[in-house]
């Protein structure tokens, strides 16, 4: 992204290079660029970026339903009390602004 690159610091230029690569990588697959690490950081320090819902979540290791998969009871079928807040949506404008603010400060 040119705006990020224009910040002119090493961190912003590196982030712009990574973003350019991710956009090219996913261009043929119909997906937007995925920014897993930045989103994980935002979840920790900018929770207003996310819309979360409380669900019962468990890892099924017995092979009864799956083999080592994370199971999220989104419909309340287990009757078990929610034990995890799960990020379900991203407020993209808030996330983008947070990321830009962080990158402006990189030296």
Model-found features: residue ranges?
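Conformational coupling and interaction surfaces
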Residues: 1-107
